[in-house]
Amino acid sequence: MKLRGCGTALVTPFKQDGSVDFAAQRALVEWQIESGIDFLVPCGTTGETPTLSHDEWLKVIAQTVEVNHGRVPIVAGATSNNTAEAVEKAKEVAAIKGVDAILTASPYYNKPTQEGQYLHFKAIAEAVDKPLVLYNVPGRTAANIETATLLRLAKIPNIIAVKEASGSLPQIMDVCAQKPEDFTVLSGDDALTLPILAVGGVGLVSVASNQIPKELSEMVRAALNNDWATARKLHNHFLALMNANFLESNPGPVKAVLAMMGRIEENYRLPMVPMRPENRAKLEKIAAEAGVLKNATVAQ
């Protein structure tokens, strides 16, 4: 399996009473696929997975698979900072027919050494027969997967890719220059996608594609086809929105815009909260200028 193109790190819609809005989630998945997205990533950070119960986590993944019906690859999130638990979660996801790969992040909070991270990911890989996509996001985990460690992990047959959100272009360039041919680098940062694609990345796991799946899929596709003029035009047009999605902690802003678009209700689970009014107003202005609010619909 080789992931390529733009994949959406899906939000998880909630109702006002705090329950998962499965009807809105179903509609979002269908809209994403109809818009030309290349793959889908349910239950990552953007999906507020830490606030989902175990049962809800599995149900969100299962419904994504059901709605997808084999049309695009599904890369389901399964992460824990307890290796034994991470292994069990990966096994559960691997057992869901229609899940194509598993996204798993570095152990967070307990700050393992590089050897600890290597053995953690190795244990997960050896426990399942599904491809693994590693998620390097040290800004959240406090545990960077260094290049030497990642290159060791890339030798494990079913570790096929990394979602790179370290924010360090020098590190990402080193990985791209030294990685095996069959190991894939995916951008985990919307705003850095074009530089990452230019040095050897082949895709993006996106937050902003929740809002603009068609446009970001076209941007990545254009870059991969060496149509850099089109890719730059789309990047420059949506760069302000990409950055505004992080005016506050993700997924606050992306869910706010989706609510403005009429695609979900704007509800969160603590500790996530609605945006401050001044930031929400700034975000709405940027979203309107980017043109994403012009076709707002009625929320499902």
From Swiss-Prot:
GO terms for molecular function: 4-hydroxy-tetrahydrodipicolinate synthase activity. The active site is at Y135 (proton donor/acceptor), K163 (schiff-base intermediate with substrate). The record marks T45, Y109 as: Part of a proton relay during catalysis. Pyruvate binds at T46, V205. It comes from the Bacteria. InterPro entries: Aldolase_TIM (IPR013785), DapA (IPR005263), DapA-like (IPR002220), Schiff_base-form_aldolases_AS (IPR020625). Pathway: Amino-acid biosynthesis; L-lysine biosynthesis via DAP pathway; (S)-tetrahydrodipicolinate from L-aspartate: step 3/4. Keywords: Amino-acid biosynthesis, Cytoplasm, Diaminopimelate biosynthesis, Lyase, Lysine biosynthesis, Schiff base. Its main location: cytoplasm. Its EC number is 4.3.3.7. GO terms for cellular component: cytosol. Pfam families: DHDPS (PF00701). Belongs to the DapA family. Homotetramer; dimer of dimers. Catalyzes the condensation of (S)-aspartate-beta-semialdehyde [(S)-ASA] and pyruvate to 4-hydroxy-tetrahydrodipicolinate (HTPA). This is 4-hydroxy-tetrahydrodipicolinate synthase. The gene is dapA.
